[in-house]
Amino acid sequence: MTAGNPAADPQGAPAEILEHRLALVMNGGVSLAVWMGGVACEIDNVRRASNGIPPRDGATEQEKAVHELWARATQRAGVRVTVDVIAGTSAGGLNGVLLATAIARGASLAGLEELWHDSGQMSAEALFRPQQNGVLSLMNGDFFHDQIAGELRQMTPTPHGRDVSLIVTSTALGSSSREVRDSAGDSFWEADHRRRFHFSRHGARPCYREGDDGYQLHDGEPVDDLTDDETLAWAGRASASYPVAFAPVEETPLLRQRRVWPDWKTSDTPDWLADGGILDNSPFDPVLESIQRKPVTGPWKRTLCFVVPSGDEAALGRDITPPAGGGAGNQPPEPPPWTSVAAAAFGFPREANFRDDIDHLHRTIHHGRSSFDVSRFLLLTDNIPAASTEAAPAAEDPLTEARRICTAVLPLYRQSCTAAAIYQVRDTIVRSRPNGYIDPVSEITDPGFGNAAHPWRPGTFPAAGDPLPTAWKWGADAADRVVRTMLRATTSESARGLRSASSEAGLGDLRKDLSKRLHQIAAISQAIDEYLVSAGTDAASLDDPIVIGMLDNAYDALGAGTALASSVAGAAQAYAGGRLAAPARAPDVLAAALAVEVSNGAGSLPDDSPRPVFDFARFGLGNPPPLLQDAYNSAMTGPDGTPNDPNNILYGTRLNHFAAFADADWRDWDWMWGRMNALARLARLLGLNDDEVNDLTKAILAAEGRGLPAVQDGITTAMNYTGKEIRDHLRSADRFPPALDALFDLLRSDAPTNPPLRTEIHDLGQAVSDLLARSGHEGHVKHHVLRDAALIIRHPFWKHVEPDR
């Protein structure tokens, strides 16, 4: 833990609060939802407390104490927490829907713990409630939907609502493919069953549309997609439709309107939607894209939080002993048993999913150059005089030298940006089509592209004394990168602790102005893309001259150069006046930002999808608060000296992730542990000291009705609980009968299947039900003689299942 926050002054009172923005990617299935709910609860607690929002509705005195401790700790650290992007998959989709709705409406998660405690139970009154439309799955998904919708209806809007973006994933069943072609023109089919639904609450953003005086920027309308309880409930229910456990759901017309993936045109036929975790476990890309569009006003820092309730990837293959280097007589050693091989074969795909997620994040961070761009920009602008009356910079100051170098390499930059434009236009057009290319860009045929003028390609680098442009010749993507560099330069030093937040006091209006101009540029870019898609719909060819002509026409028809120049020049003026106190030096500010742009693009293609600057934090099952760390470390070794599976700390990881639904005490434990994991991770992110963390640990445990010694003992109990002990406990608590009743109901169900089951298989399911279903729950019996004769088998079977029978 750190002792404080570098933004604070010597007396411990920060001059300006650092906004710590969290983007959450929530991933987990079935009863792991309970742990994730605990994490969401604690994140919401610190969000509310640090922003001066009162404790959640109906908070107990113990919960109010937690709220007060969070408020004091974050105030001392000089930080407030914002959650502005949430992506949820499976059970993460459910919790993400509830958390995002609470944030957007200014409501609270007051009922979330009760929802999981009461509704997440495998009983005939809850998840195994009889299904009205026939037995379509083991559990009653309609019951689950009704509980979620009911919780959403309780979230009454208040003045504390905040802007937030929500992405929920699902998997489409049935046909979902398009015809694509390879580089030789041969066609084949590309399937994509991933579905993403986007909900957002944000203020009015600019739009670029045609009016009486041609295309102009206009103020858009505020957006709030998080008011429709039913559509939100269906999105959460669809994302968590674990195969066979819950029936898939139909994509409603309103839900279809929120679909943003696939990004190519699909049929208008609605889909059947199943669990998002089947194909799209961790949707990082839409989260990063959403981050790009978030406006800022104060100093900020961004953390991408991966909330995933599992560490089982590390345990995979642990039961296989490595070979000892050859057996006796140079014979190969005994291979692993087939059971271990089978377990590895089924388990290793989990490793692949998790590894791909981490590799993707690593590449994103590695390829990001935003911090370096800002450093170069600051180096060039630090020597700009602070008063407009001062003389121009000396001949070889950094900015003058940069102008000279950029002028020399501009031909290389022009080639790069032309190639990038051709690639991007082709990709934009092809991705919008229901058919396309697996390699839509092919090779650029002319490495030079001649010297013809184009409205999106610069002819010269701005010289000293040049005014701000009235027509922007650098393209929309470069405009975004240039203004984004200016915006990032207003906060990155305080966020990294290199400068106190007090040095950034008064920059709020500047950040707001630059954020607005980025939205203007995004609106113009969207209009350009829409023009290109329309123009390219019937294009027989997408060779270089045709693509360049399309782009020229788009800029001319839309007046994009003039509109972009207004936004970029306005950004440079705002930065020069607001940050440098030298409004007349706006052309030099723009030249400095363009120098960064040219130096990046002269040797490679400019990046058309800039990545935000962010830290990465994984919210997982390990790393509890310090007061619980020793007990956790000790429990990692079992009584016989063998290592325990770290996943055992949660009951929700047992019985194929269903166990927490079987026992209310287990759900309460998982919820509490989620709060503990969130506290430990948030404490490190926000710079809390040890005393603050210890006080919060004890306060949260008190709010959960638990004492510290009991929790320390509970860690040992959970980690050493064997599968047999879990099954014995569930049997003694009569948890198996409703599950078996549901299984037999499904086996004898007459619900249609696709493809239709063979008659022999259906009859076998009916026979198993007739043979073993308990009295009173046997449904329609077809094999009466078999059932009567099987009493001698059925009675001891149920005696074992129900010890008190």
Residues covered by each model-derived region:
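Active-site gating loop/helix substructures
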Residues: 165-296, 447-541, 548, 552, ...
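Patatin-like phospholipase
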Residues: 18, 23, 32-156, 172, ...
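Flexible, membrane-associating and regulatory peripheral segments of lipid-active enzymes
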Residues: 1-24, 45, 84, 591
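Acidic, Ser/Thr-rich low-complexity intrinsically disordered segments
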Residues: 318-321, 335, 349, 355, ...
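Long, C-terminal catalytic modules of enzymes
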Residues: 377-395, 654-686
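Surface cap/lid and interfacial helix-loop subdomains adjacent to catalytic sites
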Residues: 107-165, 177-185, 193, 202-203, ...
